[in-house]
Amino acid sequence: MLPPKTFFEKVKEIIWPIERKELKLFIPMALMMLCILFNFGALRSIKDSLVVPSMGAEIISFLKLWLVLPACVIFTILYVKLSNKFNFEYVFYIIVGSFLLFFLFFAYIIYPNQEAYHPNNEIINSLITSYPNFKWFIKIASKWSYGLMYIFAELWSAVVINLMFWQFANHIFDTNKAKRFYPVLGMVGNIGLILAGSVLVFFSGNKIIDPELLPNSFDASVNLTSQTTEMLQPIMSIIVAAGVISMLLFRIINKSILTDSINVLDSKKVKAKTKTKLSVLESIKLVINSKYIGRIALLIICYGLLINIVEGPWKAKVKELYPSTIDYVHFMGRFNILMGISCVTFMIIGSNILRRLGWFFSALLTPIMLSITGLMFFIFIIFIEEIGSCFGNFNLLYAAIIVGAIQNILSKSSKYSLFDSTKEMAYIPLSLELRTKGKAAVEVIGTKFGKSLGAFIQSLIFIIIPTATFDSIIIYLLVIFIVMISLWIWDVVKLNKEYTELCK
C-alpha cells in the first residue's frame, strides 16, 4: 500500500502534474507555445491598432467577412495540397516561414512607404460621398495594406496555433496525457501574452499622442506615420525572432526528442503517416459526413460569432478614448498583460477542473462565463445614460471600456484554459485521417466562419444603413447573443454523449 501524499505533493499535483521523465518533451513544447502565443498577442493588438483608429471599429466586420474568410478557404486548399506533397514537419516550416517573411516586409517596406501605395484621401472622400452604401469597402481599398496585415494576423491564430501546433500535440499525446499536459501547456504558453503586452507597452510608451494634437495636415500625418514606424519595426523584429525560435524548437522535438525510447510510442503517431493522400473535395466531404466533427465545428462557430458580436462595440468605445495607432497599441499592451495574468490563473484552476470534474463540466464553463460577462457589458451599454445619472461626473466612456475589458479577459481566459483543451481532447479519439484533414477544415474554415457569420449580420446592417453605428444596433446584437449562447450549451450536451462513447 502506497503512503498517503503530503500536502506539498498534493499542491504539486494540482499546479504541475508533469512527471520528471516527461520534462524533456514538455519543456520545448511549452516554450514553443510561449513563442507562438507571444506572436498571437502582439499581432492581435497591432492589427486592431492599425484598422480601428484609421477606419473605425465597424470596419472589422467587413474585414472578417470579405477578406479573412476567403483567405481561410484559400489557405485550407493550399494546406491540403502541401500536406499531400510534404510531411508535416516541412509544411510547418513553409507556413510559419511565409508568415514571418510577410511581417518583415510589412514593417520595413510597406508601412513606412504607405503614402506611395495608398490612394489619395481626396479621391477616397469623393467616392464615399458618391457611394455612401459602399463606404466601408472604399475605406478598405484606401488602406489595403492594413487589410492585408489584418488577414495575416488573423490567420496566425487559426493556422499556426489552432491547426499546426495543436495538430502536432494531438499526434504526440493520448487522452490521458492530454488531460495533464494541455492545461499546463496553456498556462506556460499564456505567459507569452504577458511578454507581448510588456513589449507593446515598452515600445509605445514614449510615443503617446495627445488626442487634441492628431494630424490635420499632410506633414503632421507623415510625422505620425514615422513615429508609428519607429514603434512598429522593433516589435515586428521581435515577432520574427520568436517565430524563428518556435521553428528551431519544433526541429529539436522532431529530430532529438521524439526518437528517444521514452517517447517512442508517441513519435510513432507522427511518423507512421504524415502524408494522407486526400483531395480537397474529399476532405470537405469527410467533415460534412461526420456528425461528430460537425458538432466540434459548431462549438467553434458559436464562440467566434459571440466574440465578434461583443468585441465590435467594445473596440468602438476604445477608439473613442484612444484615437491614434500608438495610443491604441499602448492600451492593448496593458490589456494583454492583464489578459496573460488572468489566463495563467485560469490555467491553474482549469487544469484541476478538467482532471477532477471531467470533460462535460469543463466544456460548459466557457459558454456560461461568456453569457454572464457578455450580458453585463450589453446591459451597461444599453442603459449607460441611466447608469450615468446615478454616478454624476463619473467617466462613462472609460467605465464602458473597463466593463468590456473585464468581459473580454474573463471570457477569453476561460476559453484558453478550458475551451481549447476540451476541444482538442474531442479530436483525440478520432482516426488519424479524420483528425488530420477534418481538423484542418474545421479549425481554419470553422473558426473564421463563426466570426464571419457575426460579421455578415453586422456588415449587412452597415451597408443598408450607412449611418448606423454599434451604439445604434446594440439591442439587436443582444438578441443574437442570447440565441447563440443557448445553441452553444445545447451542442456541448450533445457532443458530450458522443465523446463519452468514443472514449470507452
UniProtKB/Swiss-Prot annotation:
Keywords: ATP-binding, Cell membrane, Membrane, Nucleotide-binding, Transmembrane, Transmembrane helix, Transport
Compartments reported by the entry: Cell membrane
GO molecular function, one term: ATP:ADP antiporter activity
Disulfide bonds: none
Transmembrane segments: 23-43, 59-79, 90-110, 146-166, 183-203, 230-250, 296-316, 329-349, 364-384, 386-406, 449-469, 473-493
Any single Gene Ontology cellular-component annotation: plasma membrane
Pfam annotation, one family: TLC
Membrane topology, record value: Multi-pass membrane protein
Superkingdom of origin organism: Bacteria
Primary role: Provides the rickettsial cell with host ATP in exchange for rickettsial ADP. This is an obligate exchange system. This energy acquiring activity is an important component of rickettsial parasitism.
Family (UniProt): Belongs to the ADP/ATP translocase tlc family.
Identification of the protein by name: ADP,ATP carrier protein 3
Gene: tlcC
